[in-house]
Amino acid sequence: MKKTKIIEQEILINTTPHEIYEAFMDSKIHSKFTESKAKISREIGGKVSAFEGGLSGKNVELIPDKKIVQTWRSEGENWPKGYYSTITLILEPVDKGTMIKFTHVDVPEGAYESVKEGWDTYYWESLKELLE
C-alpha cells in the first residue's frame, strides 16, 4: 500500500448518543440521511454497505450508544482494490448533545480529500439536519 492519511474530527450534534448510534447502525435511518441505499449488520463481523454498495466493510467493535469501529473500503478510482481502512466513532454525551470523536485511519493518500469532504457533506451535515 502506498502512503495513507488519517482523518480526525470532533463533531458536536445536538442529540443523544443513542440517536447517533442508531443513525449509523439502522439501515433505514442510514439510508435516509445519506440519501442512498445502505445495509448495515448489527453483529460483530457483520457486513456494512452504503451508497448503493460504493462503500463496504465490516463491524469490528460495537458498544451500543458509545462506540462503533468498522472497516471500510470504497469502490472509488483512487482506492486500491481489496484495501480496507478503519473508522472509529466514540460517542460522548456533553451539555449540548453528543460529541462524536471520529477517526478514519489508513485512508489512501489519493482518496483523502474526497473522503474527508464526504464525511463532512454526507455524514456530519446530513446528521445534523436529520437529528437536530
Predicted segments with their positions:
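A conserved amphipathic terminal alpha-helix motif
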Residues: 2, 106-132
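Hydrophobic pocket/interface hotspot
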Residues: 20-21, 30, 48, 59, ...
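A short, structured loop/turn motif at beta-sheet edges
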Residues: 14-18, 60-66, 90-99
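Short, solvent-exposed aromatic-acidic interface loops
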Residues: 73-76, 103-110
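Short beta-edge strand/loop motif at the mouth of beta-sheet-based domains
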Residues: 2, 8-9, 15, 27-58, ...
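Mid-chain, well-packed structural core segment of small domains
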Residues: 69-90
